[in-house]
Structures are given as structure tokens and as C-alpha cells.
Amino acid sequence: CVNILYIQAQGAGRKPFVKDIFKWNELRKVPRMSMYFNNMDTYHISYAVTGVASEDKPEYIRARRYMPQWEKGLEGTELKPEYLNTGLFKIGVTYHLTFIKYETNLYMNVKGDGQDKTFYFDASAFPKIDKGRVGLRQMYTRNSKYANFRVYQLDK
């Protein structure tokens, strides 16, 4: 199961992909990743939960910086580092996730199953984003449960 958090997401700014992504959510009913990375200006943190016998894929935590103005799709959007085979996520286990974006630094903290780990991503090589919406996305063929979802903004 792949889950994605979009942080400060905005549209590309051209019709129909106006800055406020809520205004074109109908266009995202068909789950095509290219609809997101070609038309959203955003930070993205994703994590994959494995453990499905029919899949031989590594568990991962990674981040990207979507930049539709570059017109390169996903090419060159990776934030470093990437974390593979963390051993964290197990199917059926509840986790508490905390995401922090400060300036061009992204953090993801995972607590659960007796573990507490924090992951860091450096976005300083990319244009900074300072406004936009927060969004969730997951593979449409999978299930995840979300509870107590909150967004905070710190005063400067």
C-alpha cells in the first residue's frame, strides 16, 4: 500500500489546474499519478507498506518536489535521502505519524510497534513553497485507516 502526503500543494496555475487544488478535485477522480506530478506544485512524502505475498517490492519512505513548470514529469524530483527496507510498517499495526515542514526541510516521524524513528528530507536544492493545501492520497486498490488527522501552522 502506498500512501502519499502532499504538503503545501497548489495547482500549476494554468487552466484548468488553478492554484487552489480543491477547485479541480473532480479531475483527480481517475487515479493517474501523472495528474498530480504534472499539474501540482508541492512537496510529497510517500511511504509504502509491504507484506503482501504477491508483491516482491521493498518498503520505502521517500519524498519528492513536484514542479510542473519544469515539464519533466517525475524526472529530477527526488529529495534525498531515500529510505528503503526500514522494517517499520506492518499490515494491521496502528502507527502514529507526524510530518513537519520547516523552510525547505521535511521530516516524518513514525511511532508504533515499539519503534520511534524520524526521517529527514532536504529540499533546499528546489524552489521553496510557502503556501498551499495539505492532501492525502493512496493507491486506489488498497486500504488504510486514518484517524485524528490534524494540521498545525506555527506562528513566526
Regions found by a protein language model. Give the residues of each.
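Flexible glycan-contacting loops in extracellular carbohydrate-active proteins
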Residues: 119-145
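Predominantly extracellular/luminal cell-surface or secreted proteins
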Residues: 8-10, 109-113, 152-154
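Extracellular structured ligand-interaction cores
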Residues: 32, 94-96, 105, 133, ...
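Acidic/His-leaning functional-site neighborhoods
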Residues: 64-74, 101, 118-124
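Extracellular beta-strand elements of beta-rich domains used
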Residues: 147-151
